[in-house]
Amino acid sequence: MSSRLRLTPQTVHVLDAFLEDPQEWRYGYDLSRTTGLKSGTLYPILMRLAEYRLLEATWEATEAGKPPRHIYRLTADGLRSAREHIRSYSIRHAWQAALERVRS
């Protein structure tokens, strides 16, 4: 595992979704609806965030006959990291937008 999290726009979007209520457990399907990301994009991001220990993941028992569901929430480090990543991402993109306006 690389020592640095790859910060894509999609990863920022997922982190931002968790920041809406950092203590809440979230389902992948719910996150997919919130972010608009397809499962093939979302689940690798969730796995990577869990690998970096920014998310905790567990299985939730469901009604009889239904399979258990994976649920996720931010860890304390994940909350701190999400806030830092989103702040730096926002600043970087604000500068890029300002530079583009100056150039045009």
Residue map of PLM features:
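A generic structured-segment signal
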Residues: 33, 43-44, 74-75
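Basic amphipathic alpha-helical segments that dock to polyanions
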Residues: 42, 46-52
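Surface loops and adjacent helix of pleckstrin homology
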Residues: 47, 60, 84
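Beta-hairpin "wing" of winged helix-turn-helix
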Residues: 52-67
